[in-house]
Structures are given as structure tokens and as C-alpha cells.
């Protein structure tokens, strides 16, 4: 069975899952079970279709459905196949996870199953649509279904986060539509992407289309300064939906940037400054994303900011590829794009695992606040181990997958800097430095997140009474954690496949073959493709260290309470998230402003000092204040003014109508 047949079958199964959830909506548990299990089957089918496409089974479909002017055109090539496979893995894990996690939404399980399945199906359609009309329809459906999942709790925070996401998503939609309609205008009015690929747009038109698309898809990806919805919406969505949004949906922003810049505008040729712009925004997003994450105590907000960081890292590879392609350095272009695609898949896996882990903590403790956790390793050992794998992967620690893709990104930036173009050299070096800073801060952040959540003693009754989550939730976490290990250790096999995918994207620029990228990859892969040896060495070293410690301490270790300056140890004494990041907070304090304050949250050993202390409980990044909160307050003031103008008096409304008619008549006379 070819890849397209399997893919269409998966869409049909997703629709069946959504329909089953609606038909069984009054039987809450049955609706949940049907939606999740059928969704898992659809994910398996689409995963197989995606892998077949990645390996070369490129297929398409072109038929008339509803509208003669807009053929229903789908294209499943190597690039779209990779993204289909990525989303399928997350959809499968999220479906299995939802068998228990959706129990947190009594009376809404059928609704959750319906929107979950339609959300997955709409993302699949966006990736494969080969026509402007159907692409935009699927894109809008994706935004709407994810919005309804964000607001499913129907409380103040979820509605606020969902509304902000809804607004930014539609700002991006307008920019994307403007880009596509501009291309349609210069491609003879055609809506088919195939005609865009065959049209040679002028440099000015191509640049306008790319910039519009970059910021439009950037709003969906969460690049700074269009990131404000991520820390508001991700924490409010169900955790398996957060995993799918952060791991999958925001990657559609990356897919869109690649599709427009390197596919639809391929006949026009990429320009150097496109790549420089992408790298600059990538560097800013990566550094600020992790800096903002460091200040968070809410574990899901922390992970949302890390999505901004990793989108920035992906954009570094995309930008380096574009700049190298414009300079005719095809080998570097392939290597850089391969690094970006590798990190795209890697981030989906480890961020998906981390969000599922955060959901497990919320499920067991009832809180997202890390300050109220602690001591969870002993109470939730499976979740703790799988979360540790995700934390090591996102921190780029070998032999996990994050290390491999970041290594290739470094090599791409270093090689791009040596191509003789001064502007490219400056930006590439700047990007490499930003990546190094990002890596150091990411390690610090996840030492904090893991240590404060899982180590030490419980800091609340809920943490002390926490238990391991049900088996389906553990399985979903374990699956993604295992994939993180495989993607790291399997780099020698996986990287060449991704080189082939990258070469297929860049091929329209003329004579770009996978062999050139493969040669450069083999030359500079170094430690990245040595991860199996690194893994074996680490296992041996850890085993030797544990054995040595065991032999040295037999019969010599006595357990006792830690000394606390004469006071009895209690749950308020361990280092908490606030103090752990205090040094970095001081260094980066111009980036933050207080969100709210509370007194006596930083406990001292002595009651006297405890009374005197008062620290910030949470901070808000300055860009979020300026770009999100200020416009929001402005709209609220306009709404208040409009309310005052209404007054409820019909005579006033008639006066408004008469005044409007007079204004329009005057304008008509003057124009006329």
C-alpha cells in the first residue's frame, strides 16, 4: 500500500474517532476511550505513511472537492513525510496518555476526544496540502480546534490564555494569507502550489512574500516577539495536548517557513539576507526563551518558554542553510538544513516527554508550582526517570538526541562563517555564541527544575502523598523517552536519512545532491555520530563508579538527619526554585518585571528572619509586558469607553446613526 493511501486512511480513522467521541458524548468514559483508542490507530497509520514518504515513496492526489477553482491537492513528499511521522508519534503517545489523563475533565471527555482527533487531522492536512485554499482552510481548522482544547477548563486563566492564542494565531493567519495571495496574483491567479514553484518572482516580490510568511508562520512557531501566547496557552491545555502543541503544532510554523522560502519560491532563488534575518531572530529567541524559563516556578510555563528557545535553535540551522544556499555552498546548506530537521524531530520527542511528565506531576500533586513539590523521585520513580531522560536530552547531554542535533548546528554555523561573506560571518559567529549561552542556561534551568521537583523532601502535603500515575500515562512517557535515546545513539543511521530529506528540499536550486551534504557531514560529524561509543563509555564508567562506591562504603555508612545549625530539619529548608536561579536572575534583571509578590515564601531557619523576608514569587518578562499586556489593556480601555458611549438609551443610538450618515454623505459629496 502506497504512502498516500495509508495517509488518507489515517485521516478517515481520525474522523471516525472524532465522530465516535461526539456520538458517545453522554457516556463520558466510553467517549474518552473510543476517541483515544481510535486516535492511536490513526496515528499508527499516518506514522507508517510518513516513514514511507521519508524513504522515497513520494505520492500526491489531485481531485475536485466542492470548489472547481480550488482542487483538493495533497502532496506527501520527503519533507512533509518527516513532519507527518513527527506528529504521529506525539498523537499516539497523547492518545494513550489521554486514556487516564482526560479523567481530569469530567463531563468534557467526549469534547476532548472530538477536538483532539480533529486537531491531529487538521495538522496532517496543513502539512500535505498543495493548494492555497485547502492549506488555509486546514490551518484555520488547526487553530480553532487547538483553541477549544486550550479553553476546555473554562476558567479565567484558560479563557485568557486561549483568547491571546486565538488573536495571535489569526494575526499570523492574515500574514500567511497575504503572502499566498501575493504569490497567486503573480502566478496568473492560480491557487496551486505547483504553479508557484514554476513561477520566477522578482526579487522584491519574493522578499515581500517571504517576510510576510516568516512572521505569519513565526507567530505559530512562537518566535520572539510573537511568543506571548505560549506561556499563557500551553499551561492551560490538557498536558497531552500541550505536548502535541509544543512538540507538533509549533513545528508547522517551521514547516511553513521552509515551504515558502525553499520550496514555493524556489524558482526565484533564496537571498542572503533572508538567512541572516532568520538567524538573528533564532539567536534572540533561543537566548531570551531560556532566560525567561529560568525564572519560572510553574513547570508548564517553564517548558513553554523552552519551546521558544528550541524554535530559535531550529531557526539557526534554517537561516544558515538559506545563507549558504545563496552563497552557492550547497554542502553547508544541506548540513545546516539537516541539523534543523534533526533538532525539529528531537525537540518534538523530548518536549513531548517533558510535557507528559509535567502532566503526571500535576495529576499526582494537583499543582504546577515546583515550589510545592519535592521528594517525588521516591514516590513517582518511573516518571522521575523518564523526566530525567527528557531533561538530559533538552540540555544537549550526550548520548541523548539533543546533543546530536545541536552539534550539527554548531558545525553548520562554523562552516557558514568561513564562506567569505562578512555579513554571514558576523551573524553566524553571533549565532554560535548565542547557542553556547543557551546551552549553559538550559543545563542550569533543568538542574533547577529536576532537583526542585524530584529531589530533597516534599514541600507540601500533596507532594508527600503523591503516587505514580496509571500505566498508560507511564507507557506514553517511556515511549518518548526511549525515542530520545534511539535518536541519539542511532545518529549514524538517522543522520544520512535526514541529509537525503534536506537535499530533496534544496534540490530545486540546482544540482544539490545528498552526496555533497553527506561528505561534509562525515567530515564534521565527529562526536555527533559517535554517540553509540559515548553511550557505552558512560554506562561502563557509571557502573565502575557505582561498584567502587559500593565496595568502599560496605558497613561504613550510617544514615542520619542533615545538620541544620542546631534546628530540626523541616520541609522549608531545602533550596527552592526562587533561590536556585537567584544569581542568574540578578544578572538578567533588566529582562524581568514582577508579576506578583508575596511575603514569607522564602523560608529561613530562624522565625525572626522568616518574618523579615519577602521575595518575588513570580516575574514577567519585559517583552511580554510590552507586547502582550500593554495592547491587551489598551483594548480593554477602548471597550470600557465603548460601553460608556452605549448608555442603553435608544435616542443616543439614533443620534449615532444620523451622525454616521452625515459623515458618509459629506465624504461622498467631496469624492464626487
Predicted segments with their positions:
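Aromatic-capped, Gly/Pro-kinked transmembrane alpha-helices
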Residues: 493-536, 547-672
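Hydrophobic core of alpha-helical transmembrane segments in multi-pass integral membrane proteins
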Residues: 15-19, 39-50, 91-92, 180, ...
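Interfacial loop-to-helix junctions that mark the boundaries of transmembrane helices
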Residues: 1-5, 73-80, 131-133, 196-203, ...
Amino acid at each position: 500500500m502506497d504512502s498516500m493511501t495509508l495517509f488518507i486512511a489515517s485521516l478517515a480513522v481520525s474522523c471516525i474517532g472524532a465522530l465516535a467521541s461526539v456520538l458517545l458524548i453522554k457516556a463520558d468514559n466510553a467517549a474518552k476511550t473510543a476517541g483515544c483508542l481510535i486516535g492511536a490507530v490513526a496515528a499508527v497509520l499516518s506514522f507508517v505513511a510518513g516513514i514511507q514518504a521519508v524513504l522515497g515513496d513520494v505520492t500526491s492526489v489531485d481531485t475536485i472537492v466542492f470548489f472547481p477553482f480550488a482542487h483538493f491537492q495533497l502532496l506527501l513528499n520527503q519533507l512533509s513525510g518527516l513532519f507527518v511521522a513527527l506528529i504521529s508519534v506525539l498523537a499516539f503517545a497523547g492518545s494513550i496518555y489521554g486514556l487516564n489523563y482526560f479523567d481530569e475533565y469530567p463531563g468534557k471527555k467526549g469534547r476532548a476526544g472530538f477536538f483532539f482527533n480533529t486537531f491531529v487531522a487538521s495538522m496532517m492536512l496543513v502539512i500535505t496540502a498543495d493548494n492555497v485554499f485547502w492549506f488555509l482552510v486546514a490551518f484555520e481548522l488547526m487553530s480553532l480546534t487547538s483553541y477549544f482544547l486550550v479553553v476546555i477548563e473554562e476558567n479565567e486563566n484558560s479563557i485568557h490564555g486561549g483568547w491571546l492564542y486565538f488573536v495571535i494565531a489569526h494575526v499570523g493567519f492574515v500574514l500567511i494569507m497575504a503572502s499566498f495571495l501575493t504569490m497567486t496574483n503573480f502566478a496568473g491567479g492560480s491557487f496551486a502550489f505547483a504553479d508557484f514553484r514554476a513561477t520566477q518572482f522578482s526579487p522584491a516580490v519574493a522578499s515581500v512574500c517571504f517576510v510576510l510568511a516568516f512572521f505569519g508562520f513565526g507567530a505559530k512557531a512562537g518566535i520572539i516577539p510573537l511568543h506571548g501566547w505560549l506561556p499563557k496557552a500551553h499551561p492551560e491545555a490538557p498536558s497531552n495536548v500541550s505536548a502535541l502543541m509544543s512538540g507538533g503544532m509549533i513545528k508547522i510554523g517551521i514547516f511553513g517557513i521552509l515551504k515558502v522560502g525553499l520550496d514555493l519560491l524556489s524558482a526565484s532563488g533564496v537571498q542572503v539576507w533572508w538567512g541572516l534575518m532568520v538567524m538573528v531572530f533564532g539567536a534572540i529567541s533561543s537566548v531570551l526563551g531560556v532566560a525567561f524559563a529560568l525564572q519560572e516556578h510553574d513547570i508548564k510555563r517553564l517548558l513553554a518558554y523552552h519551546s521558544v528557545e528550541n524554535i530559535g535553535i531550529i531557526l539557526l540551522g534554517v537561516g544558515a542553510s538559506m545563507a549558504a544556499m545563496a552563497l552557492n555552498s550547497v554542502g553547508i546548506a544541506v548540513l545546516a538544513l539537516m541539523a534543523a530537521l534533526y533538532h525539529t524531530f528531537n525537540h518534538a520527542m523530548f518536549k513531548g516527554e517533558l510535557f507528559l511528565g509535567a502532566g503526571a506531576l500535576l495529576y499526582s500533586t494537583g499543582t504546577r508550582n515546583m515550589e510545592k513539590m519535592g521528594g517525588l523521585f521516591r514516590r513517582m520513580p518511573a516518571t522521575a526517570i523518564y523526566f530525567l531522560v527528557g531533561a538530559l536530552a533538552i540540555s544537549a547531554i550526550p548520548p541523548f538526541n539533543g546533543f546530536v542535533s545541536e552539534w550539527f548546528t554548531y558545525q553548520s554555523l562554523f562552516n557558514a562563517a568561513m564562506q567569505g561573506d562578512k555579513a554571514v560571518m558576523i551573524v553566524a559567529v553571533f549565532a554560535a555564541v548565542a547557542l553556547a549561552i543557551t546551552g549553559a542556561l538550559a543545563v542550569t534551568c533543568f538542574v533547577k527544575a529536576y532537583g526542585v521537583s524530584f529531589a530533597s523532601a516534599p514541600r507540601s502535603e500533596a507532594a508527600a502523598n503523591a503516587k505514580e500515575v496509571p500505566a498508560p500515562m507511564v507507557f506514553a512517557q517511556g515511549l518518548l523517552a526511549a525515542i530520545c535515546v534511539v535518536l541519539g545513539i542511532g545518529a549514524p543511521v538517522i543522520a544520512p536519512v535526514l541529509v537525503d530529506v534536506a537535499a530533496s528540499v534544496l534540490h530545486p536550486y540546482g544540482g544539490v545532491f545528498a552526496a555533497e551534504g553527506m561528505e561534509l557531514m562525515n567530515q564534521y560529524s565527529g562526536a555527533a555520530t559517535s554517540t553509540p561509543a559515548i553511550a557505552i563509555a558512560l554506562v561502563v564508567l557509571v557502573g565502575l563508579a557505582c561498584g567502587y562506591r559500593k565496595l568502599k562504603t560496605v558497613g561504613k555508612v550510617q544514615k542520619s538527619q542533615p545538620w541544620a545549625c542546631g534546628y530540626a530539619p523541616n520541609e522549608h529548608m531545602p533550596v527552592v526554585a526562587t533561590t536556585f536561579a537567584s544569581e542568574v536572575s540578578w544578572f538578567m534583571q533588566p529582562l524581568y518585571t514582577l508579576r506578583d509578590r508575596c511575603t514569607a515564601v522564602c523560608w529561613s531557619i530562624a522565625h525572626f528572619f522568616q518574618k523579615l523576608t519577602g521575595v518575588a514569587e513570580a516575574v514577567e518578562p519585559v517583552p511580554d509586558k510590552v507586547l502582550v499586556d500593554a495592547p491587551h489593556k489598551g483594548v480593554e480601555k477602548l471597550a470600557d469607553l465603548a460601553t460608556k458611549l452605549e448608555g442603553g438609551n435608544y435616542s443616543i443610538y439614533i443620534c449615532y446613526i444620523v451622525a454616521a450618515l452625515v459623515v458618509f454623505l459629506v465624504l461622498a459629496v467631496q469624492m464626487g
